[in-house]
Every structure is written in C-alpha cells, then in structure tokens.
C-alpha cells in the first residue's frame, strides 16, 4: 500500500491547505479533501493545484462539495445533504496520498460524528498543524490529547507562522511529540517559494517513516 498521511490542525484558517500543498508536492503524491464546505471562492483543492506544482489529475475529487463556508454538518444541512461517514473511506492510489481535514479535530461532520471519528477509522498517521501565535500551546496540547485518546498515530507537529521558540519547544516537550518543522508565512506565495520554504524547514524523511523502514 502506498504511504498515506492525514493533515489536520488545531483550528481553521491556520494554513493546513498551504502546508498540504507543500507536502503533496514534495512527495509527488495525490491530494484529497474529503469534504469541501464553501464553493464561492477558490476551494482548497484549487489552492493545492495552484501551489503544489502537480497536474490536475493528482487532485482527487471531494466526496462532498457543500456550498456554504461553515462547519461541515451545518453546510450539509443547508444543502439538504447528510454526510455519510461510510463514503469517506480513504481512496486507494499507487502514489503517496495526502488527506486534508476540515477545521479542527472535533469539527462535526454530522450531529453525532466528528472529524476525529473518521480519522480514527482510517488508521493512517497524522500530522498536526499548529499556529505559533498566542493560544497555540493550549490548542495544540488539547489536540494531541484527543488524538492519543483515540490511539491515532501522530507523526509530529508542524508549526505555521513566525518563529516562537518557547511555544514550539513547550508543546513538543509537554506533548511528547516530534517537532517536524515550521513553515513561515511567505510574502510572495508561489509554487517555487513554497517548495523552497518547505525544503528548508522540513525533512521529508520524517513523513511516512514506517513506509520506508
């Protein structure tokens, strides 16, 4: 089976999509966003296509495309749709698969199912993306605890934003988690600038470590 990794985050709007674009590009893989909520502007799949440098056929179609930019459970209800977790099984592919979640781990997909419930069913390793700004310590440690409470493999934490060594170090130490690196905010966000920033900050060997053993 080809390597698979799930990219999740401590919150919405922290940079998971940009990180996913960098990761899938570095792995020369395929990208999948199971549930897209909000279609009026550039979707996350569109963003990854634009930034990853990969061809369009590497962007797998979403299982659900919902019109309203809201929590998936609410966006689905507005559209008159019920998200069926059984339809969110990981796709099989001969290339590395990068899966991007929506919002944070406990973001509801239905009135009774959260994203973390589906992630647990995938049995795939997770990368947790976190901000470096005020509040990230609590959010990060809570997310780490939630993953471990469900026996979800955590590859490590990827920080996004300006350097804040103390926050990054205390999260890694108290959470007993690998610090994978930090992706800075880029003044000019292009395929080339993102590729260079990711290569400078991360060791691709830290991802899919089991697959290369």
UniProtKB/Swiss-Prot annotation:
NCBIfam families: bioD
Localization of this protein: Cytoplasm
Catalytic reaction annotation: (7R,8S)-7,8-diammoniononanoate + CO2 + ATP = (4R,5S)-dethiobiotin + ADP + phosphate + 3 H(+)
Function: Catalyzes a mechanistically unusual reaction, the ATP-dependent insertion of CO2 between the N7 and N8 nitrogen atoms of 7,8-diaminopelargonic acid (DAPA, also called 7,8-diammoniononanoate) to form a ureido ring.
Record's keyword annotation contains Nucleotide-binding: yes
SUPFAM superfamilies: P-loop containing nucleoside triphosphate hydrolases (SSF52540)
Annotated metabolic or biological route of this protein: Cofactor biosynthesis; biotin biosynthesis; biotin from 7,8-diaminononanoate: step 1/2
UniProt keyword annotations, A-Z: ATP-binding, Biotin biosynthesis, Cytoplasm, Ligase, Magnesium, Metal-binding, Nucleotide-binding
Enzyme class of the recorded protein, top EC level: ligase
Entry-linked Gene3D superfamilies: P-loop containing nucleotide triphosphate hydrolases
Organism: Rhodopseudomonas palustris (strain BisA53)
Name of encoding gene: bioD
Phylogenetic placement of the source organism: Bacteria, Pseudomonadati, Pseudomonadota, Alphaproteobacteria, Hyphomicrobiales
Co-factor(s): Mg(2+)
One Gene Ontology term of the molecular function aspect: ATP binding
Protein name listed in UniProt: ATP-dependent dethiobiotin synthetase BioD
């Amino acid at each position: 089976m080809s390597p698979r990794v799930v990219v999740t985050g401590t919150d919405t709007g922290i940079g998971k999509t940009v990180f996913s674009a960098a990761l899938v590009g570095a792995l020369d893989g395929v990208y999948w966003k199971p549930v897209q909520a909000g279609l009026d502007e550039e979707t996350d799949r569109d963003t990854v296509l634009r930034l990853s440098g990969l061809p369009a056929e590497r962007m797998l179609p979403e299982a659900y495309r919902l019109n309203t930019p809201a929590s998936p459970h609410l966006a689905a209800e507005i559209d008159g749709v019920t998200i069926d977790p059984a339809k969110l099984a990981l796709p099989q592919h001969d290339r590395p698969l990068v899966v991007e979640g929506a919002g944070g781990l406990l973001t509801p997909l239905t009135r009774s199912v959260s994203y973390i419930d589906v992630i647990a069913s995938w049995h795939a390793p997770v990368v947790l993306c976190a901000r470096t700004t005020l509040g990230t310590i609590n959010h990060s440690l809570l997310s780490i605890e939630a993953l471990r409470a469900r026996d979800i493999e955590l590859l490590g934490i990827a920080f996004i934003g300006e350097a804040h060594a103390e926050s990054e170090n205390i999260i890694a130490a108290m959470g007993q988690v690998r610090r994978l690196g930090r992706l800075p905010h880029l003044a000019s966000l292009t395929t080339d600038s993102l590729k260079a920033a990711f290569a400078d900050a991360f060791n691709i060997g830290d991802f899919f470590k089991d697959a290369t053993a």
